[in-house]
Amino acid sequence: MRRPPEAHYSFTIPSIHDDTTLDCRIYHPDTLAKPKDLADLAQWRRKGIVMAHPYAPMGGSYDDRVVGIVVEEFLHAGWMVGTFNFRGAHGSKGRTSWSGRPELDDYTSFAAFFMHYISCLRPRITSDLTFVPDQSPILSNQSESAPVQDDASPMVILGGYSYGSLILRHLPPVPTILQPFSAPIAGTAADEIVLRARKLADQSNLEWINLARDETRARRKSRAGNEPRPPVTMGGEETSPEKRRSSRDVRRSLEGGSRLEIRTRLRSLSHRRRHESHEPIPQPEKKSATTTMPDVRYLLISPLTPPTSTLAAPALIHKFWSRSKDDCQEVIGKHITLAIYGDQDIFASSKKIRDRSEQLKAEPNSRFTSVEVAGAGHFWHENGVEVRLRSALKEWETAIR
């Protein structure tokens, strides 16, 4: 039995839905985790994949076997991989919802974290980097933790298996995902997510700066710094407790401020005192956070179809595998997408997936592809099907890299 890959970072972030703590992992490929020299780092293109797990009440978590297969294949191919637990999965905080909407925000939270993290990485060590102990590596004439100015945007795959693919299919376009994180209110979950992404990116950048410094000093001789460092586990929060604000508090504050402003204006009109000035209502502090827009792709493994999908997330009634069109379907259809499924899946209709896949492929400028694996069930335990799953992932990765 293979030994599972070791996460480079294990940490938590709050969900933008209600601040529920989400357990997360980031895996670095060997090119980043154990580079032989600076040339390894310089050749790496920023590319990563987020993979969501199956239904938590049925044992789904980021330790799922099929999720692990995706982690292994993409790590081996040089991709960074991010996984997370939906609320209530594998002992995580909270509980699985009946609607699916909180889980949609859970995915959005981690996807935004992942995109900010990969945008802030600077694996290409250059001579204008300044190293200061106990501080982040800083580029000359560039602010700390700014996104990398690279020749190409990061490539990010948003993926999901089973229930994870159901949530994935309801995600809005990437610009919409990132919008709440562009100027987050200080102390909110969105602000906390951006801060954690930057802090972990700073830590990775510092590792590479140390490697560059060691290589310069040792002139490519053997050094202890080339040994793999132990994984980092990080909990807690980046914001101090007195400044941390829950998502509910922020919504209540903003709604209350709006109601107060309306009442003030009505009172002013009724007493004909328009000439009097009112003190402005203090607004929560906002921070600017920019990130590089990634080149996004989608990966769906064993996607659910009705009635299973309706039972798992009734509030996300979605007819992706039908003939009707909606915004979610358009998001998937307009990007490079792979759907892999088995023809013996007890939780999905292979005929529905097959028919709709052919329709999507036939549309103008379609970038949708699908692979149907004969004899494969939902859990990919049947004889020989894991090999075919891995093969399909390898072929697709080679085609899109």
Residue ranges: model-predicted function:
Residues M1-W44:
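N-terminal cap/lid segment of alpha/beta-hydrolase-fold proteins
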Residues L38-A56:
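Short beta-strand element of the alpha/beta-hydrolase
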Residues M58, G94, A376-L389:
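Catalytic histidine-centered segment of alpha/beta-hydrolase-like enzymes
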Residues G59-I69, S350-K351:
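The serine-hydrolase catalytic nucleophile loop
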Residues I69-K93:
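Conserved alpha/beta-hydrolase
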Residues T96-V148, P175-R220, P230-E238, K243-R245, ...:
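Alpha/beta-hydrolase active-site loop
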Residues P307-A312, I346-D355, H381:
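Conserved alpha/beta-hydrolase "acid-adjacent" motif
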Residues G333, L338-Y341, D345:
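Short beta-strand/loop motif that positions the catalytic acidic residue
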